[in-house]
From Swiss-Prot:
Keywords: Cytoplasm, Methyltransferase, S-adenosyl-L-methionine, Transferase, tRNA processing. One of its GO terms (biological process) is tRNA N1-guanine methylation. S-adenosyl-L-methionine binds at G114, I134, G135, D136, Y137, V138, L139. It is found in: Cytoplasm. Homodimer. This is tRNA (guanine-N(1)-)-methyltransferase. The lineage of its organism: Bacteria, Bacillati, Bacillota, Clostridia, Moorellales. The gene is trmD.
Length: 250
């Protein structure tokens, strides 16, 4: 996969691109990240890419022309060869695992990192194909959201993770929060590893993990359960949790 990132702060990506899974994916040739400095496309001697908003108001607005020129420079094949052009924006769709899986099927992505008070609306009208938000909060710019998207998508690329089942069993990949994980030692400061995980009985372990994931989701993110394909056994387990909690409530 190729990801072009349009940014005015390419140096922010140095550590991100050279550590952990992202570094390995790049070394394996499974991920190519091309950092494009938007200022290189500014047509003024000071390389400014922002200006005052028409109609007045606080802050500055990112100009349309440098963004159009940068994207057009990345697409020598023209409109027919255009990949998704995604603007990092608090007005965008909320990013989730399903969206990561969708984007992981693309061969090429272009991510635009906004700054200042936002971007000229003509970028949305005539250049961007999608807007994505990573949450209902304000960040200085789109660089961190772009890193989040690259990380989530890269994990899903074939061959990137050593154990493919790891990506499938991560929180949200199954629609549920992940079950508790333990490693050695078996006992730590009076806290013991659940016996079922030491039993060697794979069916009991599978059932325990499923129930733990269900209960954790029920307690922390009950909204997710509406989108999960629950078995009759799952439903009975959740009903039992609900009944027990009801008995504890005065």
């Amino acid at each position: 996969m190729r990801v072009d990132v349009l940014t005015i702060f390419p140096e922010m990506f140095t550590g991100f691109l050279n550590t952990s899974i992202i570094k390995r994916a790049r070394e394996q040739g499974r991920l190519e990240v091309n950092l494009v400095n938007i200022r290189a496309y500014a047509r003024n001697k000071h390389r400014n890419v922002d200006d005052y908003p028409f109609g007045g108001g606080p802050g500055m607005v990112m100009q349309a022309e440098p963004l159009f020129l940068a994207v057009e420079d990345l697409l020598p094949g023209g409109e027919a060869a255009r990949p998704p052009v995604i603007l990092m924006s608090p007005q965008g769709e909320a990013f989730n695992q399903g969206m990561a899986e969708e984007l992981a099927r693309e061969e090429h992505l272009i991510l635009i990192c906004g700054h200042y008070e936002g971007v000229d609306e003509r970028v949305r009208l005539a250049l961007v194909t999608r807007e994505i938000s990573i949450g209902d909060y304000v960040l200085t710019g789109g660089e961190l959201p772009a890193m989040v998207i690259i990380d989530a998508v890269t994990r899903l690329l074939p061959g990137v993770l050593g154990a493919p089942e790891g990506a499938r069993e991560d929180s949200f990949a199954m629609g549920l929060l992940e079950y508790p994980q333990y490693t050695r030692p078996r006992s730590f400061r009076g806290l013991e590893v659940p016996e079922v995980l030491l039993s060697g009985n794979h069916e009991q372990i599978r059932r325990w993990r499923r129930q733990q994931a269900l209960e954790r989701t029920w307690r922390r993110r009950p909204d997710l359960l509406a989108r999960v394909n629950l078995s009759p056994e799952d439903r009975r387990f959740l009903e039992e949790i609900s009944r027990r909690e009801g008995e504890r409530t005065p």
